[in-house]
Amino acid sequence: MASKLKTFINLRDYPITLFNQIRSLSSRILTPINQSHYRKRILLANLLQRYGFPPSSLQHFLSRNNHLLNSDLVETEISLGILLSLKIPQKSLVSLISDCPNVLRSEFLRKWRVPLSNCGKHGVVSSSAIKSVLEHSSRIGIGPDKFNECVRVLKSLGFCDSTVSRILSSFPGVLLVNEIEIRRKIEFLVGIGIARDNIERFFHVFPEVLGIGTETRLKPLLDEFMKMGFSKDDVKKEIAREPRVLGLELGELPRCLELINTLKCREVIRVSIISEGAFRAGFEVKLRVDCLCKYGLIRRDAFKVVWKEPRVILYEIEDIEKKIEFLTNRMGFHINCLADVPEYLGVNLQKQIVPRYNVIDYLKLKGGLGCDIGLKGLIKPSMKRFYNLYVMPYPECERIFGKRKENVRVNKRHPAGLWKLMKPPSNLTTKEDVQNMKSFIESLA
């Protein structure tokens, strides 16, 4: 009985072991369909990598665009060859495919190859303009005939090749704007005082104006400027100086000026902000708000940041962008942190932010921090307090932070003894003054 029981146990264990072996083997052997899918994925990845696609982003790109696996690899390679023949730089080519993978359709590119090649050979349009036109047309289904007509109209207006390229690159939506609307826009600009000689410069600086309605946006915007108390000459001067003024939304400039009027800052900063006039100051606020919104802040938080840190209005846009990129890319914070710590944008990047971050990063790697230091703990402390907390206890941080020169003798602003020359002369007490004081004291007694 015991031997029979032993045999039964062995038989019972055997199928389980066999099943486990079969299951592990089947997990390593793909079905023909999955094997073909996996092989095609590898071939497509190798093809894209051969044309300059970075390996680090291939996995994410293919997972978002599974439809590319259903396309013919030969056709995909032909499409990549056509894009390369248009002399699009490798970085722009990768960006175009990542943002708009539909551009790899071979039938689409065959239609566009000849018109774009001809314009590129004659220098009419640049590679950046070709990229923008392809991306825009693949999304909304525009044909080459619209492109040829648009280029013809712009050239007939007397615009040079660089201006045509600039318009197509920054505002490819011009392909849908007809000739009558473009001429109407020119007449509007001439009517507000822009000289015809400056029209081309105007479109080169702000090509997006071609997509703004004359009756629905531009004329009501000018009426709003007049109602705010600005004269026609002031408006003309500001528009000629900065064409992007016409990109303001209705009600946007009053809101920016209201923010300036409610600022709580030192008088020196306020005077610097409005030194070039209220109109210009309001527009500078709009540019800073747009810059913050471009990186992900909602409009309300962007206004809040500018109101709490008015020095942002005085800084160049490039400096603000450098600080934001350092905050998000290097420090790893989210852009929304600026709503809580707007002071970050008001301090010097190289002199304060970078040294402090390097010290905190070093201490974090060495395990010298008991808790996580947020953006507020990094920016809020004064220079002396930060030094005493994080630098002075660790001698190796002196080199990272920059050694404080405590014993350096500070040069005096004025020569010694100057106070004696500036001291006002003392009043001499006469006998008459003494008599008057005695009389006053006696009257009190």
Curated annotation (Swiss-Prot):
Source organism: Arabidopsis thaliana
Location of the protein in the cell: Mitochondrion
Traits of the deletion mutant: Severe growth and developmental retardation. Dwarf plants with small organs, altered organ structure and nonviable seeds.
GO molecular function: double-stranded DNA binding; RNA binding
InterPro entries, A to Z: MTERF, MTERF_sf
Role played: Transcription termination factor required for mitochondrial NAD2 intron 3 splicing and normal membrane respiratory chain Complex I activity. Essential for normal plant growth and development. Binds to RNA but not to double-stranded DNA.
Name of the protein this chain belongs to: Transcription termination factor MTERF15, mitochondrial
Similarity remark: Belongs to the mTERF family.
Biological process terms in GO annotation: DNA-templated transcription termination; regulation of DNA-templated transcription; RNA splicing, via endonucleolytic cleavage and ligation
Keywords: Mitochondrion, RNA-binding, Transcription, Transcription regulation, Transcription termination, Transit peptide
Transit peptide boundaries: 1-25
GO CC terms, sorted: mitochondrion
PANTHER family in alphabetical order: CGI-12 PROTEIN-RELATED, TRANSCRIPTION TERMINATION FACTOR MTERF15, MITOCHONDRIAL
